[in-house]
Amino acid sequence: MAAQCESIGGDMNQSDPGSNSERSADSPVPGSEDDSPHDPEWREERFRVDRKKLETMLQAAAEGKGKSGEDFFQKIMEETNTQIAWPSKLKIGAKSKKDPHIKVSGKKENVKEAKERIMSVLDTKSNRVTLKMDVLHTEHSHVIGKGGNNIKKVMEETGCHIHFPDSNRNNQAEKSNQVSIAGQPAGVESARVRIRELLPLVLMFELPIAGILQPIPDPNSPTIQQISQTYNLTVSFKQRSRVYGATVIVRGSQNNTSAVKEGTAMLLEHLAGSLATAIPVSTQLDIAAQHHLFMMGRNGCNIKHIMQRTGAQIHFPDPNNPLKKSTVYLQGTIDSVCLARQYLMGCLPLVLMFDMKEEIEIEPQCITQLMEQLDVFISIKPKPKQPSKSVIVKSVERNALNMYEARKCLLGLDSSGVTVTNQSTLSCPVPMNCHGLDILAAGLGLSGLGLLGPNTLSVNSTTAQNSLLNALNSSLSPLHSPSSAAPSPTLWAASLANNATGFSAIPHLMIPSAAQATLTNFLLSGVPNYGQNTPSPPPGLTPVDVHMNGIHSECKKVTSALNGHVKPTNMKYGTISSSSLGDKVLNTNLAEASRQSNNHSSAEEVNSKTDPEGCNDAFVEVGMPRSPSHSANTKDLKQMLNSTKAPCPTRQTVKLLHGTKNSHLHGERLLSDSEMSPMEGPVTDKKAPGSERAAERAAAQQNSERARLTSQSEYGTMQAYDYEQKKLLATKAMLKKPVVTEVRTPTNTWSGLGFSKSTPAETIKELRRANHVPYKPTMTTTYENSSLSRSNSREQLGNGSDSENWRERNGIDSSQNDYSSSIGSPKRKQNKSAEHYLSSSNYMDCISSLTGSNGCNLNSSFKGSDLPELFSKLGLGKYTDIFQQQEIDLQTFLTLTDQDLKELGISTFGARRKMLLAISELNKNRRKLFEPTNIRASFLEGGASGRLPRQYHTDIASVSGRW
């Protein structure tokens, strides 16, 4: 390798008079250096000039076609009264790419003038950059090639100087992975892409064990040789120790990825036959250990996104393992492994360095805005003893174009010098529409490391809305089907609505208001049959305009602002509210299914309607199998189910598809089938979805029968019930004392909902994570999350036996409650201009300005006499188990203080505040009820308890807890 590097660098280690000497033997001697050493105005300045320009000047003089270097510098010395030392014997055509130095001596003003005149002709730094990328040291020789042929060709074609670290030759302990590329921006970016394409691509898979006597396949067999030659591959076999079978290793090049994948598939089919589709393919990616946490992202969100997007499994090594602490393992199908590998390489760090003139001043807030918009880190420092500044721009490889965009904005250039054609799909596998800034990915790469590439969705894109939605659909991953090659648009819409912050598992996604409105317009313009009576967003967020008017002008404003030509006056950043975006991105098929369902059953009405009070709720309808329940008193359960009905007769239904056939029972028919007569049984309609059903509609005149009608569409039957109320029912069923005379029959009514308290939630979570490397976050967050800290173990007990499992399987993220809380009630719509909301995920805090000074408007109409029901209505159901374990009932709860709640383990301030407000309100109501004029039968029967107001829907009031 040393010989290769010497041949690459040419005269890099030799003393080149043109690059290493300040002046040559025949250079003019600055006599004034010795004459006036103590002159306070005397100054010396040393700077580089462009080697090619100086060579051209000397060559032209030798051919008699122009002014010689001697004449050029002599004239400047005479006119500026300075002494100039320059390399007059510069070797023309040398392999060295280093720029030579010029030294000017004289008075300060004269030196400045002389330098300006020299640089006006021989300037080297005006358009020269240095890029440092990460290439594993073991792959340097593969990139360099035999005799340096590979890298020489890259340097010649791109006009760049590429330097590999010399320290790797002697230092066996510490190896450097950094490769430096110097040259023009377009050439530097092209060289980076070419280096990535020269990297080797190795895929491996295990041959199934067919028998003891089965020999290892011969790599020289005609079939294997034919595959190797056709697809330019190298195939080898490795015997596994102490077991029968072999590992097949397929080697190719990154610039031949399609052939490597096709050849591996052919080889797999040849060797494994019908088992080829069941055999996973694996590969390894060596990444420096110091980059692992950065690439994994906050709480591992980046790796989770890559696995969900590609379907591949990614395993990072144990940092304490000294042997293979840098090796990352990928496993899955051939396509998923290659795609995941490209995504990971797109997350490798990049450093772009260039010089800026000393007189250029940039305000810190402009730099901050650039960093936020372009998702880069910018550092500007003055150079010691040089009249210039050094600028360092850091980001990741998938965001390389924005690094050059930042340089263009900082230097005030007309163009970044890099076009989209220079960008490789290796670092950005998602198809690119045009050169622009992805407003979705802004702010993700360095903080959360999301998956959206820098050109997935461009602001100034002029493609049709359908193409835009398809691009978004391909760039966002479904949460439920990581192995699916084509993600379902419905699943994508569900995952988009999962977080109040905008996208699932991406914390703190901040985008400009104008960009948010533009994105929303693009998304909603392609959604058919969309109602105009959608819930308004909470105050402080950009209101959504569902029309397409003015989109092109808005795009131009955003694009120009991001390019730095127009400085936005009041650019405010706000999180994407799921109430204004997520719940609106409904798929065409989903809307069609909704229309069909509306034709068959008025109880399953899904069209967006508004009652006289303006109520417009989102009722999640998820199909789950149910059986008769005998776990609790049937009458009590039915009464509780009836109490969960919304005051509004109509609801907007969002259906999340579940891949299994479901029971025909609906929410209000959860109870025993024995209560149903044969005439009341579910009606099965086996006609085609589009056929006429007038006879059925005429027969189903009563509401109870219409409620049981099901639509036999391609999605299967659906059921409507409220998860929050089911958890309350499960709690009541578990608290119910066994009756000796009553036969208790086990049922699977609650199966899969995660309500069981038989096993701690954390134990199940650890078992499910057994095959994954645990990722411990290095920074704690302030929001509630039961898995963030072991110190919250008492709160974790309230989660039951891994309550998240039901939500994860059915496409409802644990923060779906935050989404529900942002749906506006009529009162919030009327007062949204005057309200001040503390938190969109804490409903009781949000409505404090509506309900009075204490923020908890509980009145005496509250019929519940136990703590679980109160907590459920307040959205604090996750804390029910803590109070039950401490044997605290409602009466004792009313005597608790803030310190008592802390000692119980309620560490979250928002939850304690809601409890204290409820205690205060209930105590106040109890004092009123003790007055003789206010004593009522409900008080005597149910105890001193308050009530929740009627105007606040229970779906909204119980949404802040995370299960």
From Swiss-Prot:
<feature type="region of interest" description="Disordered">
    <location>
        <begin position="668"/>
        <end position="713"/>
    </location>
</feature>
<feature type="compositionally biased region" description="Low complexity">
    <location>
        <begin position="784"/>
        <end position="797"/>
    </location>
</feature>
<dbReference type="GO" id="GO:0005737">
    <property type="term" value="C:cytoplasm"/>
</dbReference>
<dbReference type="InterPro" id="IPR036612">
    <property type="entry name" value="KH_dom_type_1_sf"/>
</dbReference>
<feature type="compositionally biased region" description="Basic and acidic residues">
    <location>
        <begin position="602"/>
        <end position="612"/>
    </location>
</feature>
<dbReference type="Pfam" id="PF00013">
    <property type="entry name" value="KH_1"/>
</dbReference>
<dbReference type="Pfam" id="PF22985">
    <property type="entry name" value="KH_BICC1"/>
</dbReference>
<feature type="compositionally biased region" description="Basic and acidic residues">
    <location>
        <begin position="35"/>
        <end position="48"/>
    </location>
</feature>
<feature type="compositionally biased region" description="Polar residues">
    <location>
        <begin position="592"/>
        <end position="601"/>
    </location>
</feature>
<dbReference type="InterPro" id="IPR004087">
    <property type="entry name" value="KH_dom"/>
</dbReference>
<dbReference type="InterPro" id="IPR047549">
    <property type="entry name" value="BICC1_KH-I_rpt1"/>
</dbReference>
<feature type="domain" description="SAM">
    <location>
        <begin position="862"/>
        <end position="925"/>
    </location>
</feature>
<dbReference type="GO" id="GO:0003723">
    <property type="term" value="F:RNA binding"/>
</dbReference>
<feature type="domain" description="KH 2">
    <location>
        <begin position="280"/>
        <end position="344"/>
    </location>
</feature>
<feature type="compositionally biased region" description="Polar residues">
    <location>
        <begin position="812"/>
        <end position="824"/>
    </location>
</feature>
<keyword id="KW-0217">Developmental protein</keyword>
<dbReference type="InterPro" id="IPR013761">
    <property type="entry name" value="SAM/pointed_sf"/>
</dbReference>
<comment type="function">
    <text>Putative RNA-binding protein. May be involved in regulating gene expression during embryonic development. Seems to be involved in endoderm formation. Ectopic expression results in endoderm formation in the absence of mesoderm induction.</text>
</comment>
<dbReference type="Pfam" id="PF00536">
    <property type="entry name" value="SAM_1"/>
</dbReference>
<comment type="similarity">
    <text>Belongs to the BicC family.</text>
</comment>
<dbReference type="InterPro" id="IPR047553">
    <property type="entry name" value="BICC1_KH-I_rpt3"/>
</dbReference>
<dbReference type="InterPro" id="IPR054727">
    <property type="entry name" value="BICC1_KH"/>
</dbReference>
<dbReference type="InterPro" id="IPR037974">
    <property type="entry name" value="BICC1_SAM_dom"/>
</dbReference>
<protein>
    <recommendedName>
        <fullName>Protein bicaudal C homolog 1-A</fullName>
    </recommendedName>
</protein>
<feature type="domain" description="KH 1">
    <location>
        <begin position="128"/>
        <end position="195"/>
    </location>
</feature>
<feature type="region of interest" description="Disordered">
    <location>
        <begin position="1"/>
        <end position="48"/>
    </location>
</feature>
<dbReference type="Pfam" id="PF24234">
    <property type="entry name" value="KH_BICC1_1st"/>
</dbReference>
<keyword id="KW-0677">Repeat</keyword>
<keyword id="KW-0694">RNA-binding</keyword>
<feature type="region of interest" description="Disordered">
    <location>
        <begin position="767"/>
        <end position="834"/>
    </location>
</feature>
<dbReference type="InterPro" id="IPR001660">
    <property type="entry name" value="SAM"/>
</dbReference>
<dbReference type="InterPro" id="IPR047554">
    <property type="entry name" value="BICC1_KH-I_rpt2"/>
</dbReference>
<dbReference type="InterPro" id="IPR004088">
    <property type="entry name" value="KH_dom_type_1"/>
</dbReference>
<feature type="compositionally biased region" description="Polar residues">
    <location>
        <begin position="12"/>
        <end position="22"/>
    </location>
</feature>
<feature type="compositionally biased region" description="Basic and acidic residues">
    <location>
        <begin position="683"/>
        <end position="696"/>
    </location>
</feature>
<feature type="region of interest" description="Disordered">
    <location>
        <begin position="592"/>
        <end position="613"/>
    </location>
</feature>
